[in-house]
Design a protein with these regions (language model features):
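A sequence-level detector for low-complexity, Ser/Thr- and acidic-rich stretches
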Residues: 1-114
Length: 114
């Protein structure tokens, strides 16, 4: 789509992995001008099906995300914690209100670190 950032990740092997995905915007404002004001993150499988959506990371999975040590620094930022089977995935970052700006998608394999 237009005005979105798309990041891809591949889970290889024969066993699933747990990932933490962060969608940042406001916390980048100290060093970058024109950041996304209210990032929303969507996780899709290889068929394009939505697996998870998050707008404000504290709205869902707050305790689990905090326990990883990877909680976004700003309450308006997004995060998803998801167990994924081997395959291809995309994370789509946009602004919940349609604004444009600079954002960052981070994907961490946290299997075994929970």
């Amino acid at each position: 789509g237009e005005s979105v950032m798309i990041a891809g990740t591949i889970v290889g092997g024969t066993t699933g992995q747990t990932v933490a995905i962060r969608g940042l915007g406001p916390s980048l404002a100290g060093s970058i001008a024109g950041t996304l004001p209210d990032p929303q993150l969507e996780l899709h499988d290889s068929f394009g099906q939505v697996i998870a959506i998050n707008n404000n990371w504290q709205d869902t999975q707050a305790a689990e995300i905090s326990a990883t040590g990877l909680a976004p620094p700003n309450a308006l930022e997004s995060a998803i914690l998801a167990p994924l089977l081997p395959g291809n995935y995309t994370a789509i970052l946009s602004d919940v209100n349609g604004a444009t700006g600079i954002g960052l998608v981070e994907i961490y394999n946290i299997t075994g670190n929970q």
